[in-house]
């Protein structure tokens, strides 16, 4: 890879603090057991708002940025609503997006099925998305910015005896992120 390719930035965003919980509460307006397809369609919107706002903020600073949904980058998942697993990321599509020189701001936490249905990955899904995209692009590194001070075997805010890791491979990180680690 040349120097420009090695310094390319891809941003994966999560919803703003509290937004996913707010959307979950909205989903209960018509009962405690909403349709799973519609539930995922609703709660995936928080990341779309974050991606668009971040792209607007970067553009206002003179940087070229564009927001993309998981569907637009062809991030394919299983059809398990709210607990989908990433099956494939279209590397050619990602490289096409990167080729225009913009900073891609991609929605985390979600994907699409082979039939185009929106699915969500469950809590921690944006971290999973970031690691999966980094792996698909053979990135040198994947930085996760969060409210936790390192990589833990599970969410330390939920499990007090979670263990902090000194180092981890990309494959190991992908596995842990898929299980909700922080």
Spell out what each predicted region is.
Residues 1-182:
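Nucleotide/pyrophosphate-binding catalytic subdomain
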